[in-house]
Amino acid sequence: LRNLLKQDKERFAVPRGVQDVIPIKAIYDDGIFQVGRDKFSKTYKFSDINYAVASREDKEAMFLEYSELLNSLDSGATTKITINNRRLNRANFEKTILLPLKGDALDEYREEYNRMLLEKATGANAIIQEKYITISVCKKNVEEARNYFARVGADLIAHFGRLGSKCAELEPDERLRIFHDFYRAGEETEFRFDIKETRRKGHDFKDFICPDSMEFTGDYFKIGERYGRVLFLREYASYIKDSMVAEMTDLNRNLMMSIDVIPVPTDEAVREAESRLLGVETNATNWQRRQNANNNFSAQLPYDIEQQRKEMKEFLDDLTTRDQRMMFAVLTMVHTADTKEQLDNDTEALLTTARKHLCQFGVLKFQQLDGLNTAMPFGVRKIESFRTLTTESLAVFIPFRVQDICHTNGVYYGQNVISKNMIIADRRQLLNGNEFILGVSGGGKSFTAKGEVINQVLAGNADIIIIDPEREYSPLVRALGGEIINISATSPTHINAMDMNREYGDGANPVILKSEFIMSLCEQLIGGNNLGAVQKSIIDRCTASVYRTYQQNNYTGEVPTLQDFRAELLKQSEPEAQEIALAIELFTNGSLNTFAKHTNVNTNNRLICYDILDLGKQLMPIGMLVVLDSILNRITQNRAKGKNTFIFIDEIYLLFQHEYSANFLFTLWKRVRKYGAYATGITQNVDDLLQSHTARTMLANSEFIVMLNQASTDRLELAKLLNISDTQLSYITNVDAGHGLIKVGSSLVPFANKFPKNTKLYKLMTTKPGEGA
């Protein structure tokens, strides 16, 4: 340990320019920096996990796992854990999240949507929090350091993985960007660095990150026109809550908080603790001897000696029997502001937050430069205010708070309630991109679904298909230039149940798959009695026969209809064929023959809405089957073109009331992903939905679930199914419309989605009486 502390001491050279203030001596291609005579450092970035909203048991598990991580730190190296609040890079944000204008009629909506996104981005959440762990070690040369980091890095990544956090090493340009963004706040977009180019031209890498000027005074410093101050944790409370770090870094300013950890080898720690305990015991014995000399044989030991003895025994027990390690820790923090007045106010706010936790922060006097270099993730430590802690007491400074979801090219779903950051998610990046939107009536389900439809229509080139049983989507679909297909017995629009393209068969003969579909259809039409083997054979033979000409013409020309299929049945000699023909007559040549005619609507529009409000009870089961089959047709067609398809099914529980449509939907749910399609089920009747085993399986297998305000019985069912803690349940209990929980993969995040009311898009999305378009 003494050697390690000695290695941290370096001769102070008076900096002759701003470059000399930066303590990096050399940088290497793999992200290793030389930060001392023979000291090398490497930084890893790790993602946040849902600690703040986890249940008590989960928090304990995370705490113990984090303690394990601290225990695994090598005692021959110094570890620095840094939380960096950096300003949102506006240009990057605009490039990745704003919708590009396309010069068509929908541009007015794109501009409106972009205005809303910019308002959200420049509000309270203009700060992004990033977390790093920097390991620095003294080695003879960079090769030795490289081998060391390769070993330690793999271990570190595995430990973070067990916590549910992704950890990755930073490249040299990524590390330099951290310093550039801090030194040159407001110029984030101007960072350009190519290590090979720099080396070829003989440029100094420090020129790319250093500010124009730096000025250090007694208790603050100035970088360019900005002011900054470094604080350190002077006094620790006896009991600290695990939320302290999260609260300290909650300030909406550029700041960095670093915890330097120096693990002490356990044998040295035990020796030190034993000698301290021996000292306390000696004091106690001497005190007792003095009392005995005064004939005071019944005297009690003074409280302070008793307390010292108790604490030393506990400390020694921690080290020897409870698997704790002794650590030295230094906690430093640097924050910046535009004016001196603002800086003083921020300092006071931070000191007040610390006092709330009974800790005392102090301002570093005449050590601002050393403090700055310690707080930033260079891998150096110039501040000596050590505090001896055990693993457990150090783990209280847990750097985790809440997970943020920000995928590139994603859809905006609202703001994270805890971090106030935007939730931008892309279902295509998940293993299974199917989605459910659940919530009571008036909770904001349709609003959420419409928001997603709008984003997909305005942003990309994917096709969107909506099944609308309540006629809620018509104004939106019309405004976005989509096609509304009204389906009913009396409607002039028809969809041919036998429509089929060459991709329908998933690489095999499409007629085989279509034959299965027609069997389901006939079972449904005949009255739900299972078909016998003879009937199935007849249906299969007739299906192949009616499609023969269409297939021979290379899937061009006129597609056969159910009327052709019935005519083919009547040609067969078996009496069973005549029975089937008679049973389906009502739906082919009778008054419910809407699906037995050629399709006469444009099903090639990018945005299609199937309006099934007027579909009667008799037609509903067959209607749902035909619509779902028509969707499958479209999906397979799009797959061949390499195009995504998004399907939105409102009031999905209606489909589960009929066995065939439920099974067809289940198959669709499982298969659509490989076709590049993503299905969304929307319902308020979670209880009804979960009665169906099929629906239950679909919900459990969906990686993307938006839960809005829930009824009490539904809440309990969802908590059981998705393992939601009581803390998390509070976000879907009696909350306003548009508030709830969003499950993205393994992340569960509380969100709020407030859309500006004075916009055209709001009027198209809302279903509140009197507010709609």
Identify what each model region corresponds to.
Residues 445:
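Conserved lysine of the Walker
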Residues 49-50, 56-75, 86, 249, ...:
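P-loop NTPase motor domains
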Residues 1-400:
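Extended, folded cores of ATP/NTP-driven motor/assembly subunits in large transport
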Residues 481-485, 694-707:
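A short helix-turn-beta junction within AAA+ P-loop NTPase domains corresponding to the substrate/partner-engaging
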Residues 437:
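Hydrophobic anchor at the beta1->P-loop junction of P-loop NTPases
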Residues 455-465:
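Post-Walker A helix-loop "phosphate-sensing" segment adjacent to the P-loop in P-loop NTPases
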Residues 722-773:
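Conserved P-loop NTPase
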Residues 448:
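Hydrophobic positions on the alpha1 helix immediately C-terminal to the Walker A/P-loop
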